Amino acid sequence: MSNIYDSANELSRGLRGLPEYKAVKAAKDAIAADAEASKIFTDYLAFQEEIQKLAQTGQMPDASFQAKMEGFGKQIQGNSLLSEFFTKQQQLAIYLSDIEKIVFEPVSELLK
């Protein structure tokens, strides 16, 4: 029987070899090469982190957060590099969701 960590590392390498992973990486590299897209992306990630911190402390985002999220949505949709990145990321997320189901299946069985 192989070491479970070896299997996890093999899975990691397999993910990096997927065309969808490579497409997300290429899209992210394109964002990094464009000052406007990079700024929006960095600001968006900081905003997401801020929302996560609120959620972790049990606080609810107020109306200003909703307005800010809508603003980011418009900026992302209006920038072809960013919209391409998020589209490619969603395609990769399908694999990650499937893998998550497979990995957590034994744990789910324990709870039944």
From Swiss-Prot:
Pfam families: Com_YlbF (PF06133). It comes from the Bacteria. SUPFAM superfamilies: YheA/YmcA-like (SSF158622). Transmembrane segments: none annotated. HAMAP family: UPF0342. Belongs to the UPF0342 family. This is UPF0342 protein SP_1372. It comes from Streptococcus pneumoniae serotype 4 (strain ATCC BAA-334 / TIGR4).
